[in-house]
């Protein structure tokens, strides 16, 4: 409940408007909305899985394509290659990565070849986020669900979306340590950018 600081008020706020999942490309009039939003923010950005084309996306809107993995019968098969037009428009690619378990590699254990080829061809950057594993839901969320009711929109914003790396017993620290170290080493080996979920460390929404 902090007051809105001066830098976050009025036109040309010193902040970036980021639109992300679900899948933003499924929303109607998204490009028109981004066009209207330009004067109010320092920059606009959208994160999409790249499966659907975003027509008329403003040129100065940053497009981050974050491909998803195909799953079948609960098994992870492979990363889905985005639509070719989305790859051509993309400013960055972003992937989630986890370390192999018991020497068993999954699609989350490496970046697909086509992404390395895209980076080499376009000279654009690829970001890699270590996967964070959870042991349970945050305590406040669990208490509300135990009462037999769903979270309100306000609660989803103020409670459900606030997750802290420091809440005891919430995250699987051993697996997360392996994932962070593995992703960092992979990035150094291949010249990619390590992208951490900083809001978890600062207990921010």
Region locations from a protein language model:
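Conserved AdoMet/S-adenosylmethionine-binding subsite of the radical SAM
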Residues: 25-205
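Conserved alpha-helical substructure of the radical SAM core
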Residues: 1-18
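Active-site beta-strand/loop signature of hydrolases that rely on acidic residues for catalysis
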Residues: 21-23
């Amino acid at each position: 409940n902090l007051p809105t600081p001066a830098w976050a008020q009025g036109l040309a706020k010193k902040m970036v408007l980021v639109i992300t999942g679900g899948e933003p490309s499924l929303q109607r009039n998204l490009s028109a909305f981004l066009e209207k939003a330009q004067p109010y923010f320092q920059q606009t950005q959208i994160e999409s899985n790249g499966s659907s084309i975003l027509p008329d996306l403003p040129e100065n809107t940053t497009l981050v394509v974050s491909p998803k993995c195909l799953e079948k019968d609960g098994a992870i098969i492979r990363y889905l290659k985005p639509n070719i037009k989305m790859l051509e428009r993309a400013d960055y690619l972003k992937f989630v990565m986890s370390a192999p378990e018991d020497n068993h590699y999954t699609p989350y254990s490496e970046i697909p070849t086509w992404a390395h080829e895209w980076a080499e061809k376009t000279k654009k950057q690829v970001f890699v986020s270590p996967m964070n594993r959870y042991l349970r839901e945050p305590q406040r969320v669990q208490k509300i669900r135990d009462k037999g009711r769903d979270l309100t929109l306000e609660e989803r914003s103020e409670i459900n979306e606030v997750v802290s790396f420091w809440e005891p017993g919430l995250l699987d620290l051993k697996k997360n340590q392996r994932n962070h170290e593995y992703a960092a080493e992979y990035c150094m080996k291949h010249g990619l950018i390590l992208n951490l979920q900083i809001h978890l460390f600062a207990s921010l929404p």
